[in-house]
């Protein structure tokens, strides 16, 4: 999961959006 939602899909293994 990303620590910050705005990072989802931008380098996260498991997007959390």
From Swiss-Prot:
Contains 3 disulfide bonds. Keywords: Disulfide bond, Hydroxylation, Secreted, Toxin. It is found in: Secreted. Coiled coil: none annotated. One of its GO terms (molecular function) is toxin activity. The cysteine framework is III (CC-C-C-CC). Belongs to the conotoxin M superfamily. Expressed by the venom duct. One of its GO terms (cellular component) is extracellular region. This is Conotoxin reg3c. The keyword Repressor does not apply. The modification 4-hydroxyproline is found at residues 5, 15. Signal peptide: none annotated.
């Amino acid at each position: 999961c990303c620590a910050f939602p705005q990072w989802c899909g931008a380098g996260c293994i498991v997007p959390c959006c």
